[in-house]
């Protein structure tokens, strides 16, 4: 069996990612792995076809990234401080592409992802980042559905 030394946990601050942390902690403890937590901010330049001055989009993007980094720092203090080996990353772009890029760049051995459980038209329109990762990742992917109350 391949040694698991680096685990990637992509997060979406809009979702309750904390509900997945017991599972993440179990895997990290089991393998003694370093946990990489990644947040991917949407690239706002794709909205440049609308009439918005380029400088405004760039400034807003910089503010969004700064806010994401600030949120990540808060999340580390509130929810992730129990992980002894922790790396955090904030990237800008398409979520699936940036996750796969991080896997390659960091030599990730396992990905743990929460899934939204979208169905029907919403899934057709928005697709599933988790589906794209499962299909394309060069390493195993564990997907976790949120528990229903």
Task: For every predicted segment, state its role.
Residues 55-70:
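A short acidic, glycine-rich active-site loop
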Residues 2-54:
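Small/aliphatic-rich secondary-structure junction motif
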Residues 3, 102-149:
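Gly/Ser-rich helix-loop-strand patches that form or flank binding pockets
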Residues 67, 90-94, 116:
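Short beta->alpha linker loops
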Residues 2, 30, 77-111, 149:
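Structural beta-alpha unit
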Residues 36-38, 87-91, 142:
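General small-molecule cofactor/ligand-binding pocket signal
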């Amino acid at each position: 069996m391949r040694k698991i030394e680096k685990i990637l946990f992509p997060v979406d601050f809009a979702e309750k990612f904390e509900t997945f942390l017991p599972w993440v902690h179990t895997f990290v403890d089991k393998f003694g792995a370093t946990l990489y937590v990644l947040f991917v901010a949407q690239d706002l330049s794709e909205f440049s076809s609308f009439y918005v001055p380029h400088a405004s989009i760039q400034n807003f993007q910089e503010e969004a990234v700064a806010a994401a980094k600030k949120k990540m720092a808060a999340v580390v203090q509130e929810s992730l401080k129990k992980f002894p080996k922790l790396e955090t990353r904030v990237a800008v772009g398409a979520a699936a592409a940036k996750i796969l890029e991080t896997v390659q760049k960091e030599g990730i051995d396992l990905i743990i992802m929460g899934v939204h459980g979208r169905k029907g038209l919403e899934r057709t329109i928005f697709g599933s980042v988790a589906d794209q990762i499962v299909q394309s990742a060069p390493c195993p992917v564990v997907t976790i559905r949120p528990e229903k109350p």
